[in-house]
A protein has these predicted regions:
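Extracytosolic ligand-binding ectodomains
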Residues: 1-176
Length: 176
């Protein structure tokens, strides 16, 4: 079982994965635990092994600043890429950097978009009632810094994601 108190020693998992000869390792953790796993894994896997995770890995470079190559071959699926050339993304990134002195991650971008989603829902519903907002969600299409979002009748979000590949301390949109 994975808990905060057991997230400091991944040697058993690392060794088992290395011995199995895998080419892709799924790491479903947040950046803090992932940095521990990747630090313990460094140099043990072949150079062509990739570590795949989702947006919880955002911020991984800040967790491995002592050696950014620890994050080499980390592939993260996320709705936000700060290096996107989209005008609205670049405006958001510049404003965020000016205000906070740091590049925004997907958590900041999702929070930013959430405010505009709520605004659009309130305007469409003409109300702040939770039931009224939920009722109009399937009618909304909101374009934010994390992309264009729609919602189905069950409230599930539909939104594209980008894959970010880290190498030598740089995260770039994979495939570009």
């Amino acid at each position: 079982t994975f808990t905060a108190s057991t997230s400091t020693d991944f040697s058993t998992q690392v060794n088992a994965l290395v011995d199995s000869g895998v080419k892709v390792v799924f790491i479903p953790f947040y950046a803090e635990e992932a940095s521990t796993f990747l630090t313990q894994a460094k140099g043990k896997f072949a150079d062509d092994v990739y570590f795949f995770g989702a947006d919880g890995l955002d911020g991984i470079l800040g967790k491995v600043e002592q050696d950014v190559t620890i994050a080499n071959n980390v592939l993260m699926l996320t709705p936000f890429a700060a290096d996107s050339t989209e005008e609205n993304v670049q405006s958001f990134v510049k404003a965020y950097e000016a205000a906070y002195g740091a590049t925004p991650d997907q958590f900041a971008a999702d929070a930013y978009d959430a405010v505009y989603v709520i605004k659009a829902a309130v305007e469409k519903a003409g109300s702040t009632s939770g039931a009224a907002l939920a009722a109009v969600m399937p009618e909304l299409e909101v374009t934010g810094v994390t992309g264009t979002m729609t919602w189905d009748a069950d409230g599930n979000t539909n939104k594209n994601a980008s894959a970010i590949l880290y190498f030598d301390g740089v995260g770039s949109v994979f495939g570009n």
